[in-house]
Design a protein with these regions (language model features):
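A small/polar active-site loop signature that marks catalytic segments
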Residues: 1-122
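C-terminal soluble interaction/assembly domains
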Residues: 90-198
């Protein structure tokens, strides 16, 4: 259970400002405190799967852009930044842990293409992990993020082929009855085949 008074005391001890407890709608707009550059935060979130950071980034982006609720902000993002996704996107929070968030591999590949055109390749390889957790693969050609929930595994990112092409990919494996290591091994085989064939 969260102890709000303890959190308030810790914040008062740390922040050089007045700390007031309350819901956003009770407190008004407030003041955003400028924090560190976003790249180190994104890198931490991508490498350690920090779902709390993901949620906080979404909340802050919502506030900076002037949206009252997360629902209206997500609707805006779906109709603007992600309007070109090929499949319907069900997006209810930023944590990535909600059973209500639903996406497809095709959508993730399209989102990766959008990212590819928004930032440099050097930024991509800085943000995306270049390792599988089992470290059985030569990692220098795959930059990808894993996602794992019970009986669900995902791997989405970029692959550099032998010819130097950069491809976006996404695997989503669910409801499997074999050990997760077998899923990872088969994914690795497919990625190696694509790397070598193209």
């Amino acid at each position: 259970k969260v102890n709000n008074e303890l959190i308030k005391k810790l914040l008062i001890d740390t922040l050089p400002t007045t700390v007031i407890l309350g819901l956003p709608e009770e407190l008004g707009k407030g003041t955003l405190i400028q924090g560190p550059l976003v790249t180190p935060i994104l890198k931490k979130m991508m490498f350690k799967s920090d779902n709390f950071l993901a949620e906080q980034l979404l909340i802050n982006a919502q506030r900076v852009q002037g949206y009252e609720t997360q629902k209206t902000y997500l609707t805006y993002l779906k109709s603007s930044l992600f309007a070109s996704l090929p499949d319907p996107l069900i997006w209810v929070d930023g944590s990535g842990l909600s059973v209500y968030n639903m996406n497809t591999p095709r959508n993730l590949v399209k989102a990766l293409e959008i990212i590819f055109h928004m930032i440099t390749w050097d930024e991509i390889i800085e943000l995306f992990p270049d390792k599988f957790s089992d470290e059985n693969i030569n990692n220098s050609f795959v930059y990808a993020k894993t996602g794992t929930l019970r009986h669900n595994q995902a791997l989405s990112g970029y692959l550099i082929t032998q010819s130097g092409r950069k491809l976006a990919f996404s695997f989503m494996c669910n409801h499997y009855t074999v050990p997760p290591s077998k899923i990872r091994a088969e994914t690795e085989k497919i990625l190696l085949h694509i790397r070598d064939a193209y």
